[in-house]
Amino acid sequence: MTIEQILEAIENMKVLELNELVKAAEEKFGVSASAPVMVAGAAAGGPAAEEKTEFDVVLTDVGSSKVGVIKAVREITGLGLKEAKEVVDNAPKTVKEGASKEEADQIKEKLEAAGAKVEVK
């Protein structure tokens, strides 16, 4: 299997499947996917802080149109009805991780149009 084939397989996975993959890789290789914590800040004259390029879209509140929000979550994530309903029922919940700024803004607009409250982190 080539790297391109692996990336393509990952690209086609649903959010829940990606989460399971990360957990399995952490257990198999004894590593953690969480970012390391920096103890000290950058020294004066050090490199400037990098601009954030990946964003997480978090569904914070469903609002009054639960059905519309479930439809939007299904459209955005490709999840089945049951999985999308679980995401909506368990808000606040991350809908998309590692999205570009443009993609995160588009997802936020779709969910807000469906009546949800959304946060981009």
From Swiss-Prot:
GO terms for molecular function: mRNA binding; structural constituent of ribosome. One of its GO terms (cellular component) is cytosolic large ribosomal subunit. One of its GO terms (biological process) is translation. Transmembrane segments: none annotated. Forms part of the ribosomal stalk which helps the ribosome interact with GTP-bound translation factors. Is thus essential for accurate translation. Homodimer. Part of the ribosomal stalk of the 50S ribosomal subunit. Forms a multimeric L10(L12)X complex, where L10 forms an elongated spine to which 2 to 4 L12 dimers bind in a sequential fashion. Binds GTP-bound translation factors. This is Large ribosomal subunit protein bL12. It comes from Clostridioides difficile (strain 630) (Peptoclostridium difficile).
